[in-house]
């Protein structure tokens, strides 16, 4: 069996960003997957996708049984990811990961929030801002946090984006818009436990892997994964949380 591992590399715009560690992590993951597959006796090819040569690189993929898709461009680089996913779909080769349409849906948190609302799945109170001139809704609940809608991996999540009153919303929204391209949203901050839950498709149905809990050593509005607490090992915030994989789970969680 032969597997081709395709992964996104930092664009020229993002490679100089303070958030480039997220793309470095994609490369590390690709190499780890390559190593694991080799140990299982599977032949592999690693393809680091560059935004300037997406079409030629993907079109050149031949004689492989499966494409392991690790394309993870988001934010202003989202069009590159959409293009790459659409090309992978045209090859007629089985692939892992999202389809083009699915990638678009899950890359925009506002779209996901609307889908949850439509399906009556409860989520924290929220409001989207496209221009920064919108008035804050009276229904917003505080404290809230201001998030970029098109980024992942805690990009844009920081302590200074917590808002405790309606009068501060406009200032924080504009600041977030200056930092990142695209719309932002304000979401009620809810204290509680945080879990990472991976879901795979198995025989056409969702298959839930064991949850992993992020346990915080702080409380209140300090207890969430900022970019620094997730990626910067030298930052004080990094030591405020740890990963915990319990052997058993409370029935109410499952």
Residue ranges: model-predicted function:
Residues 14, 75, 153, 194, ...:
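Conserved protein kinase catalytic core
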Residues 48-50, 99, 127-130, 164, ...:
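Residues at the C-termini of beta-strands that transition into short coil/loop
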Residues 12-15, 152-155, 234-237:
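Short acidic/His/Gly/Ser-rich catalytic and metal-binding motifs that mark active-site loops
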Residues 1-94, 101, 107, 111, ...:
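ATP-binding N-terminal substructure of ATP-dependent carboxylate-amine bond-forming enzymes
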Residues 22-29, 165, 250-253:
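Residue-level preference for long, well-ordered alpha-helices that form the structural scaffold
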